[in-house]
Structure formats: structure tokens, C-alpha cells
Amino acid sequence: MTAVNDKISTIVNGKRVITKKPELLAPAGNLEKLKIAVHYGADAVFIGGQEYGLRSNADNFTIEEIAEGVEFAKKYGAKIYVTTNIFAHNENMDGLEDYLKALGDANVAGIIVADPLIIETCRRVAPNVEVHLSTQQSLSNWKAVQFWKEEGLDRVVLARETSALEIREMKEKVDIEIESFIHGAMCIAYSGRCVLSNHMTARDSNRGGCCQSCRWDYDLYQTDGANAVALYGEEDAPFAMSPKDLKLIESIPKMIEMGIDSLKIEGRMKSIHYVATVVSVYRKVIDAYCADPENFVIQKEWLEELDKCANRDTATAFFEGTPGYEEQMFGEHAKKTTYDFVGLVLNYDEDTQMVTLQQRNFFKKGDEVEFFGPEIENFTHTIETIWDEDGNELDAARHPLQIVKFKLDKKIYPSNMMRKGK
């Protein structure tokens, strides 16, 4: 049973409701993903600029795109945070002040920082921008949280390795905003402090170049002089060093009652289908619990929905304590994705019942597809006829980003998505 926190709730018409609803924080690797995240229910979005972030392989944002994203988010009451969480070397100092000033001028709500140099510089040149301490600082005790509060930071992003008991003590002893991960990839290294990528590919993982070496397939040998004995691999399936992905959907009630301020989804390099699916599910969970915590139950369809965009097994990692063997991913990878994202709705004409769709994966006549979006309940439909933009009939939508049309007798909306089972 979840412990009740009276500081975050009130009684309305004889029923307890949560008044301190946590922020739902979503990832976005480009402007399209940012807009999708906000449209599907994110309260805030974290993005990376083209410098000083840890995901150089994401599309990332120009200053102009950041400003556009901020203006878009503002219309929906959402915030934008920018990652500037590299561990800076001397050559990274050139241009830092100008970059942080530009972020301030773009009216971003906050920056996510690991390096004290960047913290000090931001507070000096962009004083209106909140400073959030990155998970790269590996905070896992309340004294460290207290230290950074005294340094003037507005929020701390906890290490993924922090347990529920440790987080509870932090909230009780330190008055500062706490952000905690709820969904996404885990790292074999402590909060991302890893140099495997540096050694294996000459890409600095702490300056945006991580190639996810821990997810490669490995064989393990024990050597004794000239002899090598395979301990794992060869006839067995190769193993990966990386743990299972994080999924804390069933722990959301506990996290809300603990007073955690921001619940964070990982995945700036993930697809818009991933962003839309995961954000929409956690939006429903948070809203449902806050509206009626006493009668809250995790719905089966929420769990099934998350599985539609997952390609790895999941676990609760460190939140409920030290993970055991079952939390790790050894042996053959379990590919769990059950659906392909095949199209983004651009328009729906109610008079003609015609859908205009941008193709994102192959589909054909006769396919059973599923539609989902924040304005609709999920439903399935069988594709009967497909036309191109010029009205020519097609047997399939074969080309990436091709604009196609087809009939649908249920109303849908722009930015709704279409997917099909594998």
C-alpha cells in the first residue's frame, strides 16, 4: 500500500485529490519530437542544443529552433529545458558565454548542467535561467543534495541508481526540486560516467559521443596462458553488458506521494512514436492517480501500450533496492516491439471522411492498422483503398514520407498516429 502524504493533497467533496501534481518531463531530439511531446501531454521537454550536450548523434536544435520550441511550448503552458551537461575541457570554454546568453534570450526555462564552470557561467550571464544539476553528478544522498542547494541550484536530477528510501529522505531533509527518471535506458556506468566509448571508438561519451558500447554483443573468455575457454558466447548467444530498460509505471503512485517534483522520461534519440506513446501513457497514469488516489488501479491497457514501443525487456532497476540477476540483460536480446509506426496524420476532412497521412513505414491495402492520439480512444481499421496526392490509386504506401490518402469513417486529428502489428 502506498504511504499517504497529506502535504500534497486536499479533500474535495469528501474525496482525497492530489494538489501537487508532478511535472511530466519528456525528451525531444528535434523540433518535431518537441511538438509531439507537448501535444501528447508533456508538461516540460528537455532538448539539446548543437553544443555542450551529451547526445551529439541526436538531430539537436539551433538557437532559432530552440526559440521556436519555447514559443510553441508556451502556448500549451509547457517549459523547455536545454542540456548543457558535458564535462568541459579547456577547448570547450570558447563561446560558452555567448551560447548561454543566447539560451537566456530564447527564454528557455532552465539548463541541465554537470560542470561547475557551466553552472557559474550561466548564473553570471543568464541569471533568469534556472540551473538544474544533471544526473551526471551522480547524486544519491541528501547531504550532496543539500550542498548543491546551498550553491544556489534550482533543481537536482538524481542518479538512476538512487532508491525510493533515499529519495524520500532527500525530500524530507532538503527543500529543493527533485527530478527522477521513470522510463528509458539504463547505463552500465554510474549515471553515465563511462569511457568505454572513448576507448573503443575514440568518441568521448562525456562530451556527447557515447556509442552505447555496452549494448554491443560480446563473448566472454577466460585465458590461461595460450588457452582460452569460452565462458559465455560462441555456442551460447552473445551477451550485452547493459541492463534492462527502466519502467516505473507501477511506482508512480509512490513517487507522487513522496513529493517528487519532476518525473523524467529518457530518450532524446527515440522516434516520435516512442515519445507519443510513452508520454501519453504516463500522462494518463499521473492524471488518474491525482484525481482519485484511493481508487487508483494500473490499467492493463497502459502496460500493453508501453509494450507497443518497447524493443528491450524492462525492470524497476534501483528504485525498489539493489537489482538482482533478473534485472540484467544477458544472453539473447528479447526484442519486444510488437507494432511498427507507419504514419502521421496531417489532416482529416469530415465531409469526405478522407485522411491525409505522411507515411513513416510500409503499409498496404488490406492491412489492419491502429490509430491513437490524445483526442481519441485507440481503434483499429482495415485499409481498403490508398491514393497518392494526385488521386492515383496505390496498392501500398512504399516511399518514406510519402503523402497518401484513404477513407476513414471515424474522426481523427492532426498529429494522431497510425501503427500496425508485426
UniProtKB/Swiss-Prot annotation:
Record bears the keyword Transferase: no
Top EC category: hydrolase
EC id: 3.4.-.-
Gene3D superfamilies in the cross-refs: Translation factors
Any one GO molecular function term: peptidase activity
Top-rank lineage group of the source organism: Bacteria
Gene Ontology biological-process annotations: proteolysis; tRNA modification
Record family assignment: Belongs to the peptidase U32 family.
Protein name: tRNA hydroxylation protein P1
Organism: Bacillus subtilis (strain 168)
The organism's taxonomic lineage, starting at the top: Bacteria, Bacillati, Bacillota, Bacilli, Bacillales
